[in-house]
């Protein structure tokens, strides 16, 4: 059964990416591209591993240990839940007695007994309802507390030492970590608290009413109920086990579908602009068909001849022309149909087509979930609804099937029936729990995988760079001679890699060799010294590894040979091409990565900073927004309200405010005018900020004293820039060929 289930899941992946071809088959590459499954085989392997077994239970225990890491509040809630369950179970006993008294008073006509039973019943049922509400309240608080504990635990690990970046950049074992931290944890804790509630009250009901059934009926009563529901449990177990894998896949598909729409929201303007040109091309495709050269009736060769032979020749030519005319019309009709079909297909945006394919895969698997859930619900409900018949069968045994046959009093029938029904209801809770466990198992797998991968990445020394602060006694420090990149197709042995910290006077790279996260070597043996006050410009083709070198210097990416000596993190500041703006006020944008709790900026300084770069109108706009109460500070999203140039200027003001000794700017002025760009470098020079820039503009040369140039052949060139009246740039080039170690001088720019 499990094997067929995995095959069905594989069919879901394949069918969702199948084309309209007659064979109906698709390659693995099509599956990966259309569903964005970069690791389809790996995912199927994970699905096969996620089954309801002992390994899953051990994963669950590890999560429970986290939930009870601070045990006082969880244990207190557990005891309150247990006490409320005991009270509700005890009160329910009187409900059966009251029903017996009411039934007896009606058959005997005892009005006083009837009224007193009703009054007592109000108290009993009211108390039972009150404790039921208390139990639900405790369950909600328990879920809230567990979510708080688990989410904060995972977030603490996820954000520690930029672990989130390592996972997203270097590891593909976790899909949609945002979904796992947000919705998966919420759903898991809600389900778990509900299951715990049923597992606490269920045993109490079973134990208590087992005793009552034994004392009021005989030993066979609880034995029959036990056997009946153990049979139901094993049948449900067979149906439930395959659902773990299906639910795991469903959670992944839901996350991928949500992520796709999140990307559409983030890039809505770009998508709309790209598709404007697409509409024009569609219009051209319709007009091109109308320009086809073909014959019609007006182009027939008409000429009147009296001669019979000439008339016959005319008739033959007319037939040929008509035949060509007919073929042309058929051809034009076919082209029109094909064009209309293409236009119809092109009406869908690429994003819409992707969303459609993702949604079809989601719906296909959801249909399987529904069918399997139907089977589980059927078996569960069957055992629940048949329990009254089992109850009456048990009561009938002493009446019809034992040697000492004796009729039962009506009051006895009521009490015995109620006790059997309550015992059956206790077991029914376990049957109902099995439905929740199938959903819970998927969340256990996803959350535990998140925790396991975070811990493994934290312990993976191949992604770490040892950073030490040098002093006069200790100028160097060696690392092990063999370090291997994990999770790569190829292993890369490293001889020496090290980042040492100085007092902020220079950044030095000594024989640094670095690779992409996929293991492709970019450049080797880069040696360069950037002293304070000497700006460095890095130029080269797109994708040549310019930004990668910035990541290496920052310590985000590992490098595998050489050493780096640089200032401490507090003396360095990084500006990406796409600025990062948080939800908050403009003051919070400038303070980032600090918060208002740590620092504040006076309004006069804020105004001066923004005026310096001609965007002080943003402060007035923010004041208007606050005054009109359109949005609160916490959720204010400036990213959607500012142009790319304004966003880059905000990031530059952030840099100017923090005044680091070194700034690493990755095309951070690409969206602002050259006049403002000149002002940026001028202000940075006034404040003593040494800049390492990545860029393509020739205008950047005059703000730097050294050029590090990359080419497409993985060679690097270190060049001195000589500015003459800021009009021209003469560059004395030192050409270092990594293959021949040949040193030559030439000129790059005229």
Swiss-Prot record:
Protein name in the entry: ABC transporter D family member 3
Residues binding ATP: 540-547
Taxonomic lineage from the root: Eukaryota, Amoebozoa, Evosea, Eumycetozoa, Dictyostelia
Ranges annotated as spanning the membrane: 63-83, 123-143, 188-208, 215-235, 382-402
A biological process term (GO) from this entry: long-chain fatty acid import into peroxisome
Annotated organism of origin: Dictyostelium discoideum (Social amoeba)
Every ABC transmembrane type-1 domain range: 74-362
Subcellular location, record wording: Membrane
Similarity-based family: Belongs to the ABC transporter superfamily. ABCD family. Peroxisomal fatty acyl CoA transporter (TC 3.A.1.203) subfamily.
Positions with biased composition (Low complexity): 15-26
Bilayer disposition of the protein: Multi-pass membrane protein
InterPro entries named in the record: AAA+_ATPase, ABC1_TM_dom, ABC1_TM_sf, ABC_transporter-like_ATP-bd, ABC_transporter-like_CS, ABC_transporter_sub-D, P-loop_NTPase
MF-aspect GO terms: ABC-type transporter activity; ATP binding; ATP hydrolysis activity; ATPase-coupled transmembrane transporter activity; long-chain fatty acid transmembrane transporter activity
Recorded superkingdom: Eukaryota
């Amino acid at each position: 059964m499990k094997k067929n289930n995995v095959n069905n899941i594989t069919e879901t992946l394949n069918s969702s990416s199948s084309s309209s071809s007659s064979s109906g088959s698709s390659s693995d590459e099509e599956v990966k591209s259309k569903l964005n499954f970069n690791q389809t085989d790996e995912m199927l392997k994970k699905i096969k591993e996620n089954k309801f077994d002992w390994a899953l239970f051990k994963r669950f225990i590890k999560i429970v240990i986290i939930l009870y890491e601070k045990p006082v509040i969880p244990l207190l809630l557990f005891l309150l839940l247990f006490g409320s369950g005991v009270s509700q179970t005890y009160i329910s006993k009187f409900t059966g007695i009251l029903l017996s008294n009411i039934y007896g008073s009606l058959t005997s006509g005892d009005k006083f007994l009837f009224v007193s039973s009703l009054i007592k019943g109000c108290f009993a049922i009211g108390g039972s309802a009150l404790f039921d509400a208390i139990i639900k309240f405790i369950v909600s608080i328990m879920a809230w507390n567990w979510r708080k504990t688990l989410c904060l635990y995972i977030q603490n690990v996820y954000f520690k030492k930029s672990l989130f970046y390592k996972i997203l950049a270097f590891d593909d074992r976790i899909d949609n970590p945002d979904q796992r931290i947000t919705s998966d944890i919420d759903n898991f804790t809600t389900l778990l608290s509900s299951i715990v509630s049923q597992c606490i009250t269920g045993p109490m009901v079973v134990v208590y009413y087992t005793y009552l059934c034994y004392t009021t009926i005989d030993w066979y009563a609880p034995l029959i109920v036990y056997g009946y529901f153990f049979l139901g449990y094993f049948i449900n177990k067979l149906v439930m086990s395959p659902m773990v894998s299906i639910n795991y896949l469903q959670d992944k598909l839901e996350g991928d579908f949500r992520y796709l729409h999140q990307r559409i929201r983030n890039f809505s303007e770009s998508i709309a602009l790209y598709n404007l040109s697409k509409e024009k091309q569609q219009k051209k495709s319709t007009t091109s068909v109308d320009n086809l050269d073909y014959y019609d009736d007006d182009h027939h060769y008409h000429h009147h001849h009296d001669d019979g032979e000439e008339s016959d020749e005319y008739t033959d030519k007319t037939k040929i022309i008509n035949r060509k005319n007919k073929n042309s019309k058929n051809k034009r009709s076919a082209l029109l149909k094909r064009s209309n079909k293409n236009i119809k297909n092109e009406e869908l945006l690429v994003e819409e087509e992707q969303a459609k394919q993702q949604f079809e895969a989601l719906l296909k698997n959801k249909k399987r979930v529904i069918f399997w859930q139907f089977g589980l619900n059927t078996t569960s409900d069957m055992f629940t609804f048949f329990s009254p018949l089992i109850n009456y069968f048990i009561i009938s045994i002493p009446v019809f099937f034992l040697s000492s046959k004796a009729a039962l009093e009506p009051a006895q029938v009521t009490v015995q029936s109620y006790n059997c029904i309550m015992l059956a209801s206790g077991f029914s809770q376990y049957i109902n729990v099995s439905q929740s466990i199938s959903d819970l198992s998927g969340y256990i797998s996803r959350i535990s995988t998140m925790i396991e991968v975070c811990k493994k990445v934290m312990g993976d020394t191949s992604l770490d760079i040892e950073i030490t602060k040098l002093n006069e006694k200790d100028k160097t420090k060696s690392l092990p001679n063999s370090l291997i990149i994990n999770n790569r197709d190829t292993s890369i042995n490293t001889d020496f890699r090290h980042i040492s910290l100085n007092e902020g006077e220079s950044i030095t790279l000594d024989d640094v060799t670095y690779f992409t996260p996929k293991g492709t070597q970019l450049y080797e043996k880069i040696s360069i010294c950037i002293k304070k006050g000497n700006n460095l410009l890095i130029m080269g083709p797109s994708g040549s590894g310019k930004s990668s070198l910035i990541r290496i210097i920052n310590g985000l990416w590992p490098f595998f040979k050489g050493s780096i000596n640089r200032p401490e993190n507090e003396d360095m500041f990084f500006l990406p091409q796409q600025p990062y703006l948080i939800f908050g006020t403009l003051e919070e944008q400038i303070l980032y990565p600090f918060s208002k709790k740590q620092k504040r900026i006076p309004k006069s300084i804020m105004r001066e900073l923004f005026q310096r770069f001609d965007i002080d109108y943003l402060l007035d706009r923010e004041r208007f927004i606050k005054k009109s109460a359109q949005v609160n500070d916490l959720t204010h999203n400036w990213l959607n309200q500012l142009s790319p140039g304004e966003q880059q200027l905000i990031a530059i003001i952030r840099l100017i405010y923090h005044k680091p000794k070194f700034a690493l700017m990755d095309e951070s002025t690409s969206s602002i005018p050259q006049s403002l760009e000149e002002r940026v470098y001028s202000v940075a020079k006034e404040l003593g900020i040494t800049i390492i820039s990545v860029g393509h503009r020739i205008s950047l040369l005059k703000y730097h004293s050294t050029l590090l140039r990359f080419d497409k052949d993985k060679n690097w060139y270190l060049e001195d820039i000589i500015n003459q009246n800021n009009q021209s740039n003469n560059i004395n080039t030192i050409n270092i060929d990594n293959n021949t170690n040949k040193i030559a001088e030439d000129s790059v720019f005229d």
